[in-house]
Each structure stands twice: as C-alpha cells, then as structure tokens.
Amino acid sequence: MESLSEVSVQFSQLSMFPFFDMAHYLASVMSAREQAGALDIASHSPMASWFSAMLHCFGGGILSSILLAEPPVGILANTTNIMLASAIWYMVYYFPYDLFYNCFFFLPIRLIAAGMKEVTRTWKILSGITHAHSHYKDAWLVMITIGWARGAGGGLISNFEQLVRGVWKPESNEFLKMSYPVKVTLIGAVLFTLQHGHYLPISRHNLMFIYTMFLVSIKVTMMLTHSAGSPFLPLETPLHRILFGLRQNQAEVRESPSSSGAKGKPSKKTLDKDSGEQSNKKDK
C-alpha cells in the first residue's frame, strides 16, 4: 500500500511539458484533421484550418478565461506552446506525402498519444479548479464549471469550431447530446471539487492516479474495440428513467385508455362497408 502511495505521489509531480503537451496537441490536431471537410479547408484557407486546430488544442483555456471574465487572448502569451502546437498542425496537414500523418496514424502510436492526452485532462481539471478557487473561495459550482471547461473545452465549444470551418450543426451541441469525454470530465470536476473541500476521504495524489488510470484504460479499450458509445450508458438509462421518466410514464398512462377505446370502436371504413352491404341486400 505504501508503494502504491509513493507511485501516486511521484505521478502527481509529473510535468506536462513538453512530452504530454505534445501528445495532447498531436491527438487534438489528428482529431481536427479527421473532421468532414477539414482537408478542403486546409487547402483553401490555411488560416481557418490553423484557428480550428488551435481551438481543439486550447479550447479549454479559452472557454475558462471567458467564463472568468479574463481575456481569452491570454492563451497566446504562452508562445512556446502555441509554436509547438502550430508546428504539429503544419506537419499533420502539409508534410510531404502525408508521411507525418501516416506515421502517427499507426495504432500503437495513436494509443500512446491518446493515453498521454488523458493524463493531461486530469491536470487541466485540477488547474481549472485551483484557478477558480483563487477567484471564488469554496464556490463549488464555479469550481466545477471551470474545471469542466478547462478539461473539456474543445468539446464544449465544438459548435464555434465548426463555424470557423463554415459548418453549422446546432443538433451536435454537447449540451443536447454529451459525448463521453465531456461526461467523464464533468464527473472528474465534481470528484476533485469534493476532494478539494475535504468531502472525499482520499488524498489528492491518490485520486489523481486512480482517475487518470480509469481514463487511460477506458480510452484505450474504446480505441481497440472501435466503440463510439458511452461506457456510462448502462447506468445512464435506468437513472434517466428513475429521475426524469415520471412525466413520460404519466403520459403513457393517459394515452393508454384512449388507445384501448379506439380499438373497441369500428373504423369509418368498416361502417361504410357494412352500410353498403345492407343497401345491396335491400336492392336484392
């Protein structure tokens, strides 16, 4: 048990720059390139393609800055990270013969990059919660919101990113149909906020280690099995019925008598047919 605690302490002291940040930028830009029409945008409007890729990479920082009334352009002050993400964007889109993209499209490399990106998600959630706490002391909702925005900002602002590429899909709003990364980030923001308020009997470094291992294992499993659904679905369905299905059940109960009554009544077509047969009998 002590060895596990030591491992979690050392894990919590990992530096995200440069390797984990590079993996995050690589996975984000690869995801941006695989969007419909992304290559056409890159060939006709490189500036729009670059801005779209930067939203994928730094969307969490931009969204959290907007929510805290801070200048969103402050992300540009980190010149080193911007240049690193821009270099990866250029090589993914414009490297001769797509050698860079095809090299990192190799599944084992993509698994490593995706796993490292999930590690950065934990650090982003924590940094968002800490940053929100410095502005609003022990404001739970603010801390959860900023941690959620910092960790899943790229998904939460996906509609704006689509507008940059000239696409408008309001039905793809994350608030209407949350994707797995957005859901699991919200859960992480709640857990780390509770831990920050000492309402969870677990140390921060242990929670970081357990949560990150969960993220990495689920992400790798989903990529290996080519699963696009949420692993939380078996829990979401019964919970939704229990918490939000009451009105739906009442509506079904109200509709059932009318439907059963309708079954007992003869249709208009049947009545017309019967009346026609009776008139024919009279003529005979």
Curated annotation (Swiss-Prot):
Q: How does it sit in the membrane?
A: Multi-pass membrane protein
Protein's name according to its UniProt entry: Trimeric intracellular cation channel type B-B
Superkingdom, according to UniProt? Eukaryota
Q: What Pfam families does its record include?
A: TRIC
What's one GO BP annotation on this UniProt entry? regulation of release of sequestered calcium ion into cytosol
Record organism: Xenopus laevis (African clawed frog)
Region (Disordered) spans which residues? 250-284
Q: Does the keyword NAD apply?
A: no
Give the family this protein belongs to, as stated in its UniProt record. Answer: Belongs to the TMEM38 family.
Q: Which residues lie on this side of the membrane: Lumenal?
A: 1-15, 69-79, 122-139, 197-204
Subunit-level organization: Homotrimer; conformation seems to be controled by binding to diacylglycerol (DAG).
